[in-house]
Amino acid sequence: AGSEEYFMNLLADAMEPLLLANGIQFVRNDPQGTVGNSIRQSNADSYDFHLALHSNASGSGSEGQNRGIIVFYYPGSVSGQRAAELFASALREIYPLPDRVTTRSAENLTELRRTKAPAVLLELGYHDNAADAMWVQEHIGLIAQTLVQALTEYFGLPYVCPGPSQTGLAVTDSGGPVNLRSYPSAQGQVIVQIPNGSTVTVFGRYRGWYVVLYGDALGYANSAFIQL
């Protein structure tokens, strides 16, 4: 047994290596903080997306009687609605009652109303329903993978299965820098140039590209210029 907070943090823990392997940088909220703290943290920088992980609770008198997943977005947010529909579509593939995975707009949820970035709030089943609670507990890894796959689709990235992280060196024959790009393509935007001989961390591979962390910059580098 455990609290909603406990299992949602386990889920976030499981998502971390998948996000890194897919070139998606992230910041997590303080588990001890309030919703207000999470909103302020989200608005303190120029983030591309805000994802809130929750489980639902039935109203008084109907505890344990409800099941289902609700994906909330703020009304009028085109990006938020698009993300919500991607999450819902992916979750229908793994939730035992796919017809009970729905999207819904909501004006009254502060994590949607007050965040600057497009936002989605996930209610992953009802924690007062034994079957829903057990489904979450027994499928943390699968749920994490499903959510990250939806995020890669949202960001237009290929999904990469994570391997063990490895230390590598950025090396070019010319001695010039290695471009770290936002997408695994020579047309991808250059995020930063990695000086020749620099140490990097490699989290995954997609075709001829490695997912690389250099300093605090995460992106894709041509595997020809990374020695493991």
Name every feature range the model reports, one short phrase each.
Residues 78-103:
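Active-site-adjacent substrate-binding region
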Residues 43-45, 63-65, 112-116, 194, ...:
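Extracellular/periplasmic catalytic domains that process cell-envelope and extracellular macromolecules
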Residues 31, 184-189:
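Short alpha-helix capping/helix-loop boundary micro-motifs
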Residues 160-179, 192-196, 204-206, 225-228:
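SH3-family beta-barrel domains
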Residues 2, 50-55, 59, 103-162:
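Active-site-adjacent mobile loop/cap segments within catalytic or ligand-binding domains
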Residues 1-78:
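Catalytic-core regions of hydrolytic enzymes
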Residues 215-226:
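A short macromolecule-binding patch
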Residues 197, 210-214:
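SH3/SH3-like beta-barrel fold
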